[in-house]
From Swiss-Prot:
Location of the protein in the cell: Peroxisome
GO molecular function, one term: manganese ion binding
Name of the protein: Isopentenyl-diphosphate Delta-isomerase 1
GO cellular component: cytoplasm; cytosol; peroxisome
Residues annotated to bind substrate: 36, 70, 74, 87
UniProt keyword annotations, A-Z: Acetylation, Cholesterol biosynthesis, Cholesterol metabolism, Isomerase, Isoprene biosynthesis, Lipid biosynthesis, Lipid metabolism, Magnesium, Metal-binding, Peroxisome, Steroid biosynthesis, Steroid metabolism, Sterol biosynthesis, Sterol metabolism
Gene name, Swiss-Prot/TrEMBL: IDI1
Binding sites annotated in the UniProt record for Mg(2+): 40, 51, 146, 148
Catalytic activity line of the entry: isopentenyl diphosphate = dimethylallyl diphosphate
Origin: domain of life: Eukaryota
Annotated motif Microbody targeting signal, positions: 225-227
Cofactor binding summary note: Binds 1 Mg(2+) ion per subunit.
Length: 227
């Protein structure tokens, strides 16, 4: 694996690069484990390295979507606006559990606490709904990028927030119209959004949002959408 100098990067974020992500093939079958660092180097991504990930979309009882702006300390896509929470299950027994995507949902609960300070008891795995999966690839800069099969998870709940400033620069709840305005700002270069959020907003998000009481029609655990 290539050697990359991380001395100039945020120390807390560099520590997280040692976490072990789940390596998968293009059909989301586990084939091994690799560090977060190696999973996110473009040099490895270009050779086909692919890992499992998730994206959470949390709506409050007013049907507003919780967005976050990634902190400037983040190694990939710093300062970008994105959906509620995006991260990776780790290669450990609890988060490798594949039955009903329980491992991924446990990972989402863990990261909602770590990033946004949401108490674990407010987002139990059984209240995190697994819809479908998308497969995408994107570069952050010349060194770092993403290549993931992303589990799409929806939560509908009012939650307590206490964000970690090392993870999150800002957050806000938005209506559909407010998100459309934010997407226009991103298109004009006024703000930055993450590539996966851009993809999901352009394809599925508003359909889900229009049908929050009838999400079963969008549940598809067989297909992986190639974006």
């Amino acid at each position: 694996m290539p050697e990359i100098n991380t001395n100039h990067l945020d120390k807390q974020q560099v520590q997280l690069l040692a976490e072990m992500c789940i390596l998968i093939d293009e059909n989301d079958n586990k084939i091994g484990a690799e560090t977060k660092k190696n999973c996110h180097l473009n040099e490895n991504i270009e050779k086909g390295l692919l890992h499992r990930a998730f994206s959470v979309f949390l709506f409050n009882t007013e049907n507003k979507l919780l967005l976050q702006q990634r902190s400037d300390a983040k190694i990939t896509f710093p300062g970008c606006f994105t959906n509620t929470c995006c991260s990776h299950p780790l290669s450990n027994p609890a988060e490798l559990e594949e039955s009903d995507a329980l491992g991924v949902r446990r990972a989402a609960q863990r990261r909602l606490k770590a990033e946004l300070g949401i108490p674990l008891e407010e987002v139990p795995p059984e209240e995190i709904n697994y819809l479908t999966r998308i497969h995408y690839k994107a570069q952050s800069d010349g060194i770092w990028g993403e290549h993931e099969i992303d589990y799409i998870l929806l939560v509908r709940k009012n939650v307590t927030l206490n964000p970690d400033p090392n993870e999150i620069k800002s957050y806000c709840y938005v209506s559909k119209e407010e998100l459309k305005e934010l997407l226009k700002k991103a298109a004009s270069g006024e703000i930055k959004i993450t590539p996966w959020f851009k993809i999901i907003a352009a394809t599925f998000l508003f359909k889900w949002w229009d049908n929050l009481n009838h999400l079963n029609q969008f549940v598809d655990h067989e297909k992986i959408y190639r974006m």
